[in-house]
Amino acid sequence: MTKEFHHVTVLLHETIDMLDVKPDGIYVDATLGGAGHSEYLLSKLSEKGHLYAFDQDQNAIDNAQKRLAPYIEKGMVTFIKDNFRHLQARLREAGVQEIDGICYDLGVSSPQLDQRERGFSYKKDAPLDMRMNQDASLTAYEVVNHYDYHDLVRIFFKYGEDKFSKQIARKIEQAREVKPIETTTELAEIIKSAKPAKELKKKGHPAKQIFQAIRIEVNDELGAADESIQQAMDMLALDGRISVITFHSLEDRLTKQLFKEASTVEVPKGLPFIPDDLKPKMELVARKPILPSAEELEANNRSHSAKLRVARKIHK
């Protein structure tokens, strides 16, 4: 049975309006989720335009088929159930050589967080899972119970940026020697027990960063985003645009770096002109990230950490 997707879209108008949508264009929503961005983008297209929507979660696609039904009936939407790291290959299979714009809403979606059984939330007791793609083999249970101490420390530092990574990894190691760690609540309590009392008084849940780290590892989120964004920039037509929403510093740092590399050029000083093959292929549409308005922040608590970066294709 399909579970309803209740998802408040973040930076809805900013993300799509910044794409400067052409009514007859070909567009991609790389992270379908609750289909809010897709629905608004489709409202700007004529019947000659087309949207390709990616999601590896069948539940998201099932719900989007209801929400976007009027556009589906007009033949304006193609759903692709796959990880967006396969963006270029899947679009080529569909006969698409270039696109006019693409948007990303990175990270875990609200419905995935809210569905207890998915095991993403440290606030709800559930089996350790955290897979965005339910067909994938690696789960949070595998990471927590089978990764050795050094690998746990590595992912906690790298993806969670938690200064107590070593202490937490050691506590996990000790706990699983007694019995496997099976639920989100068990893990959250172990993490909590590894932190000093003064840390527990700080704002925010003590398990937040570690849960983020495990989720990123399970889904290879940063690796997939890196590959996909580069493919997207390659596939953009001239004047095509890419919008990327991020929710934590690791995603934002990655996006900023990819855009910087694509929009700058390293040439010797005094060179009279820049050869075509060295010209930057992108330019930043906004120098600084676009943040949610005060109204949105008040209406949607989950928008607080959101940042939007936008770039435009200027050279093939």
UniProtKB/Swiss-Prot annotation:
InterPro entries hit by this protein: RsmH, SAM-dep_MeTrfase_MraW_recog, SAM-dependent_MTases_sf
One GO biological process term: rRNA base methylation
UniProt keyword annotation of Transferase present: yes
A Gene Ontology term for the protein's cellular component: cytoplasm
Localization of this protein: Cytoplasm
The entry's keywords: Cytoplasm, Methyltransferase, rRNA processing, S-adenosyl-L-methionine, Transferase
Gene3D superfamilies: Putative methyltransferase TM0872, insert domain, Vaccinia Virus protein VP39
Binding annotation for S-adenosyl-L-methionine: 35-37, 55, 84, 105, 112
Superkingdom of origin: Bacteria
Keyword rRNA processing: yes
MF-aspect GO terms: rRNA (cytosine-N4-)-methyltransferase activity
EC number: 2.1.1.199
Catalytic activity: cytidine(1402) in 16S rRNA + S-adenosyl-L-methionine = N(4)-methylcytidine(1402) in 16S rRNA + S-adenosyl-L-homocysteine + H(+)
Family according to the record: Belongs to the methyltransferase superfamily. RsmH family.
Biological role: Specifically methylates the N4 position of cytidine in position 1402 (C1402) of 16S rRNA.
HAMAP family: 16SrRNA_methyltr_H
Record-given protein name: Ribosomal RNA small subunit methyltransferase H
